[in-house]
């Protein structure tokens, strides 16, 4: 094999990364660049799309140097990205008409309220699988069209293009030749019919968004175009693309119905592959596209917890109880339990399955005997309790009782958290040897598209489990602990 490597571009909320993988899925080299976060008003979050491109393109150049390889050695590039973040740009000059509006930004709440008043909430859920919320791209696009001078007129003349970050990167990598997205990213816009896999005319009319600005939707594993790194060397295929959480699902090889993964980052994102059926949640979860490849679509149920690792950051930065996130395991293990203390980290409300923006954080069960160790342990347990909430909702929606869950993200290095997650859910927790599963998913999609790997069956033999955590507590204790959590949550709402 003359081409020995795949490069994954992992464009995240705070940094851009590039990782080189070899045929055995081992990491050869990586590069990372952070970029600016902008908060022009309370609740608003923006990025400079040109800075994102500069950071991502520089990591691509740097990672080749670190791996000591040339473009001729690279079979393909795969892309994974922060989802929902919205860019609108001039198709001739390539200049954005406004900063990228980030998925966290809440500025379009009034637009959501207007759409709810028009009675569109149920149609949006049935068509897109999403809740009507500023989180998703559709209302962000509308805000730009309605509020940036001259932009709507230019869009209606066919002068502008829209894209989520995947689309923006492909357009830049191909020097403006390719305007494309994949089903996983399209499914996060609130404009895409996940059943027909088409942009939805009724929603485009309701949002008043011209179809001409939208990208073409192609499979998650396909050759979209070619790029030359820094304008030099041979052309490399851009051949795989998926939103970050779906990419992690694929990187964990959760490719069959009933398989699930939980990513422990700033928040927690739990996705379960539901196969060819788009299961409509009755318990506060999102219905989304898991992957679109091999001529078909697999769907997923998704639940998000707002405060995962961010809860540990709060312990460190606001309370000063720890110096480093890694310290939490040491302190948590110094006590047998939390002494009845529950921390409900509803600092920005509660996500799935509650969707309660007005809930606020609380420490429940404090007594004179409670100490730092109990509070730190309660913070870690809260991450696992919230994931149990999601797992229970998924089991009810899918009628599938999960036996195993694969995990990834920074917090999975915490053995205490992983063991408690297994204990409180009564589910086996599998921690992979390689936890860079988001980037690995993009690499898999690209490699499969160009024949670097023959099939997902081949990939299964390369995916190793570093450790599995099995439930160790009795059902009686599990039920008692979780009942205490549920009672504590009611006090925050």
Curated annotation (Swiss-Prot):
PROSITE patterns: FGGY_KINASES_1, FGGY_KINASES_2. GO terms for cellular component: cytosol. It comes from the Bacteria. It catalyses: glycerol + ATP = sn-glycerol 3-phosphate + ADP + H(+). InterPro entries: ATPase_NBD, Carb_kinase_FGGY, Carb_kinase_FGGY_CS, FGGY_C, FGGY_N, Glycerol_kin. Glycerol binds at residues 83-84, 135, 244-245. GO terms for molecular function: ATP binding; glycerol kinase activity. ADP binds at residues 13, 17, 266, 309, 410, 414. Belongs to the FGGY kinase family. PANTHER family: GLYCEROL KINASE, SUGAR KINASE. HAMAP family: Glycerol_kin. This is Glycerol kinase.
């Amino acid at each position: 094999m003359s081409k020995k490597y795949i490069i994954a571009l992992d464009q995240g909320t705070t940094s851009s990364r590039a990782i080189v993988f070899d045929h055995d899925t081992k990491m050869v080299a990586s590069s990372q660049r952070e970029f600016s976060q902008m908060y022009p008003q309370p609740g608003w979050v923006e990025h400079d799309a040109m800075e994102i491109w500069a950071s991502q393109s520089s990591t691509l150049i740097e990672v080749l140097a670190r791996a000591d390889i040339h473009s001729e050695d690279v079979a393909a590039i795969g892309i994974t990205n922060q989802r929902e973040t919205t860019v609108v740009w001039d198709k001739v000059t390539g200049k954005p008409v406004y900063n990228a509006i980030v998925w966290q930004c809440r500025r379009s709440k009034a637009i959501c309220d207007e759409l709810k008043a028009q009675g569109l909430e149920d149609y949006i859920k049935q068509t897109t699988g999403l809740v009507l919320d500023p989180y998703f791209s559709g209302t962000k696009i509308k805000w730009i069209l309605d509020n940036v001078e001259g932009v709507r007129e230019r869009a209606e003349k066919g002068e502008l293009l829209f894209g989520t970050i995947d689309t923006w990167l492909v357009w830049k990598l191909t020097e403006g030749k390719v305007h494309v997205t994949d089903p996983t990213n399209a499914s996060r816009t609130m404009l895409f019919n996940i059943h027909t896999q088409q942009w939805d005319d009724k929603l485009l009319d309701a949002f008043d968004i011209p179809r001409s600005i939208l990208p073409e939707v192609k499979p998650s594993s396909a050759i979209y175009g070619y790029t030359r790194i820094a304008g030099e060397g041979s052309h490399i295929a851009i051949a795989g693309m998926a939103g970050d959480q779906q990419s992690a699902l694929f990187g964990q090889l959760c490719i069959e119905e009933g398989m699930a993964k939980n990513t422990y980052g700033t928040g927690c994102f739990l996705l379960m592959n539901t196969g060819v059926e788009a299961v409509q949640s009755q318990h506060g979860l999102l219905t989304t596209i898991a992957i679109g490849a091999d001529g078909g679509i697999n769907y997923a149920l998704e639940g998000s917890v707002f405060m995962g690792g961010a809860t540990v950051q709060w312990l460190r930065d606001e309370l000063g109880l720890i110096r480093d996130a890694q310290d939490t395991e040491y302190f948590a293990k110094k006590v047998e339990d939390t002494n009845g203390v529950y921390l409900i980290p509803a600092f920005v409300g509660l996500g799935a399955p509650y969707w309660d923006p007005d809930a606020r954080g609380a420490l429940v069960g404090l007594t004179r005997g409670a100490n730092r160790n109990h509070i730190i342990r309660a913070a870690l347990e809260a991450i696992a309790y919230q994931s149990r909430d999601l797992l229970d909702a998924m089991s009810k929606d899918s009628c599938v009782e999960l036996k195993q869950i694969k995990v990834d993200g920074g917090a999975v290095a915490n053995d205490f958290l992983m063991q408690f997650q297994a204990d409180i859910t009564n589910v086996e927790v599998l921690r992979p040897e390689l936890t860079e599963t988001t980037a690995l998913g993009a690499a898999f999609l690209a490699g499969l598209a160009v024949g670097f790997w023959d099939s997902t069956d081949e990939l299964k033999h390369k995916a190793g489990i570093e450790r599995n955590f099995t439930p160790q507590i009795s059902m009686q204790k599990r039920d008692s602990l979780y009942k205490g959590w549920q009672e504590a949550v009611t006090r925050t709402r």
